[in-house]
């Protein structure tokens, strides 16, 4: 069970927790794949993108998968496109890739081509928690900029102001306990005062190892069925309330 008396902050995963997995895999990823070439070919983007592209080149040079496109040492940004598209298809969590994806999504969100379809229970739960004085944060493999776009353009309007902190894999891998130790330290809270909600057993295990409270998210369409070994698993964030609601196990 959740220790609500000691709880001070709730940190949420995104995919499979606050929105359907198929929005990410079926809408966001294809949009980025389609528009990366345009981003890479824009002259006014060359200087801002250079640090990210340099990181991608290093990752490509040291890529150990035989299925990856053959390495090219060309300095033409478009030479990176086959590798970037391959990374998207593999759902790699490479930080510079995630930042590049976020840049393509910015245009999509601002143009109205993309709108985040949150689960219906998410916005009411976030607002209720904030009203109770709980601090809210996001920890996702998507870049911080992409997270802010995600919550700034939802089916329930702009919810970005509800969140105090945003964390991506620049903090550290989501499957490593040290990342959650750093997260709690950044919030300036004891680990037990932080609740992490995710649909991934690897992430839940890492957060639990760091001393955080955890809650599994079991949504329709999630690729993983969470084990009953987790202390709390819910199918709706509305099931989480200090008053001891039904639906916890």
Curated annotation (Swiss-Prot):
One of its GO terms (molecular function) is magnesium ion binding. Pathway: Amino-acid biosynthesis; L-methionine biosynthesis via salvage pathway; L-methionine from S-methyl-5-thio-alpha-D-ribose 1-phosphate: step 3/6; Amino-acid biosynthesis; L-methionine biosynthesis via salvage pathway; L-methionine from S-methyl-5-thio-alpha-D-ribose 1-phosphate: step 4/6. It catalyses: 5-methylsulfanyl-2,3-dioxopentyl phosphate + H2O = 1,2-dihydroxy-5-(methylsulfanyl)pent-1-en-3-one + phosphate. CDD domains: HAD_EP (cd01629). NCBIfam families: enolase-ppase. Monomer. This is Enolase-phosphatase E1. It comes from Synechococcus sp. (strain RCC307). The lineage of its organism: Bacteria, Bacillati, Cyanobacteriota, Cyanophyceae, Synechococcales.
């Amino acid at each position: 069970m959740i220790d609500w008396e000691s709880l001070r902050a709730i940190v949420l995963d995104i995919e499979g927790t606050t929105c359907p997995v198929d929005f990410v895999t079926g809408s966001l990823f294809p949009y980025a794949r389609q528009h990366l070439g345009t981003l890479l070919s824009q002259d006014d983007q060359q200087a801002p993108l250079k640090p990210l592209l340099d990181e991608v080149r290093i990752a490509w040079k040291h890529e150990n998968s035989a299925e990856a496109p053959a390495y090219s040492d060309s300095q033409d940004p478009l030479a990176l496109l086959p590798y970037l598209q391959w990374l998207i298809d593999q759902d790699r969590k490479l930080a510079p890739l995630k930042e590049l994806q976020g840049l393509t999504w910015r245009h999509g969100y601002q143009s109205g081509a993309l709108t985040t379809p949150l689960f219906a229970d998410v916005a009411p739960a976030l607002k209720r928690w904030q009203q109770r004085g709980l601090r809210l944060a996001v920890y996702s493999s998507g870049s911080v900029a992409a997270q802010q776009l995600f919550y700034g353009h939802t089916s329930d309007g702009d919810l970005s102001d509800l969140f105090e902190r945003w964390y991506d894999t620049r903090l550290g891998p989501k499957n490593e306990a040290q990342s959650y130790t750093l997260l709690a330290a950044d919030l300036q809270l004891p680990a037990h005062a932080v609740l992490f909600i995710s649909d991934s057993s690897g992430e839940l295990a890492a957060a639990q190892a760091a001393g955080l409270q955890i809650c599994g998210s079991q949504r329709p369409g999630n690729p993983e069925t969470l084990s009953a070994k987790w202390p709390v698993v819910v199918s709706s964030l509305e099931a989480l309330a200090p008053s001891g609601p039904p639906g916890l196990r």
